[in-house]
């Protein structure tokens, strides 16, 4: 299954750098896209590593991307948080 989303860029988050538990260095950035429909849909996507570092779009640009779903538990393991992680920008 291919998950695609096309929308207008409405927010560009700051680039964040961190080290994972297994010692890998990661770069992450969040972007928010909104559709131009009668009832607009808005979604926040996470860009990682090369996508985050090479992101050169501006607010208002139309972007099409492909993404995967990821879920991670909180520290207590009592609640899960979903993440939409982009893996290709068009």
Locate the predicted segments by residue.
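Single-stranded nucleic acid-binding surfaces, predominantly the OB-fold ssDNA-binding core
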Residues: 1-90
């Amino acid at each position: 299954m291919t998950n695609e989303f096309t929308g207008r860029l409405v927010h560009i988050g700051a680039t964040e750098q961190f080290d994972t538990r297994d010692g890998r260095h990661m770069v992450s950035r969040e972007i928010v896209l909104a559709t131009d429909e009668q009832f607009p849909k808005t979604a926040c996507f996470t860009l990682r590593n090369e996508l985050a570092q090479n992101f050169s779009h501006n607010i208002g640009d139309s972007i099409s991307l492909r993404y995967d779903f990821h879920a991670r538990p909180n520290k207590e393991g009592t609640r899960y948080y979903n993440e939409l992680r982009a893996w290709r920008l068009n």
